[in-house]
Amino acid sequence: MAQLVQAPAPVPDPLREQLRMLVQRREQLVQQRDDERRRLHQATLAMVRACLIEQIGDLRRRIQRMNQAIKQVRCQLDDALAHALGTVPGIGEVTTASLMAYLPELGTLDRRQIAALVGLAPYNVDSGQHCGKRRIRGGRATIRRVLYMACWSVVRTQASFKERYQQLRARGKPAKVAITACMRVLLIRLNAMARDRTPWREVIG
């Protein structure tokens, strides 16, 4: 069974806290924008539609300003790490910032510890009804959501990840299980990159 990791509490960092608050606020603004877009799709009254269009435009501008602030703080926090993570296909500036804000332990733990910390380390469920089933539990749901979105981009663009995903699906694994396995591999790769401050390299063969 994978052991749940109780990582040492990171030393408080004012810049990291700023980054976390900016990322959280951006997430809120994106959610508001998406909600307004859905309302626009349903609205039929011209005045209501005009109001929604104006609101969506305002939210878009706020998100852009938040993106600029996130980029500035992220580079101040750790420019080398930001650059390394930014070389991963499918991982843009906001994803990089989310990893830096919500996972300060990245690069400081070994592969098993980082997987367990995030909640991507599988463990066996042995019982009279379910013998040998593999599950994941606990961990940081926010980081798993970030990795989930990023991993689909990596699977689409990187041959080794695409092959891994397809092999798992061919063996009868559900899509969720297959992408979770790829997320675990991606996290381990990111952890090594953060530790060594090295760029992404596609694994051939």
Language-model features and meaning:
Residues 170-205:
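Basic, amphipathic alpha-helical segments enriched in Lys/Arg and hydrophobic/aromatic residues
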Residues 85, 164-165, 190:
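Generic hydrophobic alpha-helical segments
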Residues 82-89, 135-139:
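Cytochrome P450 C-terminal beta-domain/meander region
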Residues 4, 102, 106, 189:
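Active-site catalytic microenvironments for nucleophilic, acid-base chemistry
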Residues 93, 98-171, 175, 202-204:
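Phosphate-backbone recognition surface of nucleic-acid-processing proteins
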Residues 1-87:
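Long, charge-rich intrinsically disordered scaffolds of nucleic-acid metabolism proteins
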